[in-house]
Amino acid sequence: MATPKRRMSRANTRSRRAQWKAARTELVGVTVAGQRHKVPRRLLKAARLGLIDLDRR
């Protein structure tokens, strides 16, 4: 792992951290057993196969 050679100022640290933004999970519509649900894209296949209980929220 890379280690810094010098101490980074508080202002530089905070401005660097401020660039990072969390993105909301994109929800995709899927129809399972005649009902429409919105699930994250990474769970789309599992929802179609019935591996996820979509009624439980």
UniProtKB/Swiss-Prot annotation:
GO molecular function, a single term: structural constituent of ribosome
Stretch list, region Disordered: 1-20
Protein name: Large ribosomal subunit protein bL32
Native source species: Mycobacterium leprae (strain TN)
Gene behind this protein: rpmF
GO cellular component: large ribosomal subunit
Protein family membership: Belongs to the bacterial ribosomal protein bL32 family.
Biased composition (Basic residues): 1-19
Domain of life: Bacteria
Lineage: Bacteria, Bacillati, Actinomycetota, Actinomycetes, Mycobacteriales
InterPro entries in the cross-refs: Ribosomal_bL32 (IPR002677), Ribosomal_zn-bd (IPR011332)
